[in-house]
Amino acid sequence: MIVSIDVDAQKTFTPLCPDELPVNEGHLIVEELNAQAALADLRVMTKDAHHAAAKWLVDNPVDMLKPTGLPDADLTWVAHAMVGTRGYELLDGLPSAKEYDYSVWQGVDPELHPYGACFHEIEEKLRTGMIERMRCQNTDKVI
């Protein structure tokens, strides 16, 4: 089984949301993600989904990437991918969230800011189920 993963393909990481965490030309990856998915049996989506009361939030980008002292949200970040905002949305041209075979929403809890889709926190104790799902599907390749 081949699984294709669309990793955080959201407007927050593009010039479409310049006040969040824009990556130059980040919005131009859709064609490649769709081509990659055409080679797979299953398509997975990961998505940052942050809370307005997140304890790692700072207003000014100058204050980003500073230690928070929190065990599962180690650094400060400006608001990005806040649920319900434009930055939270998937890029245009991708399937809707309901059309993916499996989805992982990361960072929903205000005290958590994980950097991956397999665990909800930095200590890697709270599993998202992605690894287990891939094992159950007999995944032998991930793209």
Predicted ranges, named:
Residues 1-108, 116-117, 135-140:
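Active-site acidic carboxylates
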Residues 111-136:
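Alpha-helical scaffold elements lining the catalytic groove of polysaccharide deacetylases
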